[in-house]
């Protein structure tokens, strides 16, 4: 499949022009929204993206440690380790991180959605949320496969325990409901405890 050059992708990002006392200043739309303490987590959760999200969280904490940060999520999930880097930073920093699902929050995306500040986790009305157990695939010697299988079981148990804490669901319910892909509407995600509310409009 043909990949668009980075220069073409960059050209598709809208620019915002602001008037200041020193004249005009232009920002790409994401940088402008970062000034409003808005971060976008869009697409596959992977190491490079996680590093950018972590850097933005730390920057906004240094700017105003007492103001909320808004993390908008539209993601099919991805790497557990990359996702946990974002999650741990969300819990570590002083500002509350409010999470909002736009489109979809699946797998690690759903975990990060649930990991937002209590009372400040939201879905938009037509978004979808999906939880499941972590995926794993490994080839090699039998003893190495056994080691990796044990590791993924440990990760599964850890994620289930943390999801139980964030949702208020018993661990047995989480284990059952993450055994296979489990899709939820925005209202179902709120009822389950993955988010606190469904937002139709601001205010």
UniProtKB/Swiss-Prot annotation:
Question: Any idea where this protein resides?
Answer: Cytoplasm
| Catalytic EC class | hydrolase
EC assignment: the record states: 3.4.21.92
Catalytic reaction annotation: Hydrolysis of proteins to small peptides in the presence of ATP and magnesium. alpha-casein is the usual test substrate. In the absence of ATP, only oligopeptides shorter than five residues are hydrolyzed (such as succinyl-Leu-Tyr-|-NHMec, and Leu-Tyr-Leu-|-Tyr-Trp, in which cleavage of the -Tyr-|-Leu- and -Tyr-|-Trp bonds also occurs)
Gene3D superfamilies reported for this sequence? 2-enoyl-CoA Hydratase, Chain A, domain 1 (3.90.226.10)
UniProt entry keywords in alphabetical sequence:
Cytoplasm, Hydrolase, Protease, Serine protease
GO MF terms listed in the record are: ATP-dependent peptidase activity; ATPase binding; serine-type endopeptidase activity
Q: Which Pfam families match?
A: CLP_protease
Q: Name one GO cellular component term.
A: endopeptidase Clp complex
Q: Does the keyword Protein transport apply?
A: no
Q: Where is the active site?
A: 107, 132
Entry's Gene Ontology BP terms: protein quality control for misfolded or incompletely synthesized proteins
Main location class = cytoplasm
**How is the subunit organization of this protein annotated in UniProt?**
Fourteen ClpP subunits assemble into 2 heptameric rings which stack back to back to give a disk-like structure with a central cavity, resembling the structure of eukaryotic proteasomes.
Q: What does this protein do?
A: Cleaves peptides in various proteins in a process that requires ATP hydrolysis. Has a chymotrypsin-like activity. Plays a major role in the degradation of misfolded proteins.
The record's PANTHER family line, in alphabetical order, gives: ATP-DEPENDENT CLP PROTEASE PROTEOLYTIC SUBUNIT
* Protein family per UniProt: Belongs to the peptidase S14 family.
Protein name as catalogued:
ATP-dependent Clp protease proteolytic subunit
- Gene that this sequence comes from: clpP
């Amino acid at each position: 499949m043909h990949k668009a050059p980075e220069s073409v992708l960059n050209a598709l990002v809208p620019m915002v022009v602001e008037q200041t006392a020193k004249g005009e200043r232009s920002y790409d739309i994401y940088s402008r929204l970062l000034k409003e303490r808005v971060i976008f987590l869009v697409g596959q959760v992977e190491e490079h993206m996680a590093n950018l999200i972590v850097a933005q969280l730390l920057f906004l904490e240094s700017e105003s440690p007492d103001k909320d940060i808004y993390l908008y999520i539209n993601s099919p999930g991805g790497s557990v380790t990359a996702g946990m880097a974002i999650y741990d930073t969300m819990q570590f920093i002083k500002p509350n991180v409010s999470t909002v699902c736009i489109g979809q929050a699946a797998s690690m995306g759903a975990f990060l959605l649930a990991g937002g500040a209590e009372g400040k986790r939201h879905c938009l009305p037509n978004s979808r949320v999906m939880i499941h157990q972590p995926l794993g695939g490994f080839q090699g010697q039998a003893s190495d496969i056994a080691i990796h299988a044990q590791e993924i079981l440990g990760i599964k148990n850890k994620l289930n325990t943390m999801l139980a804490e964030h949702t208020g669901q018993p661990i047995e319910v989480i284990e059952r409901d993450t055994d296979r892909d489990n899709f939820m509407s925005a209202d179902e995600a709120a009822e389950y405890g993955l988010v606190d509310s469904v937002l139709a409009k601001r205010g």
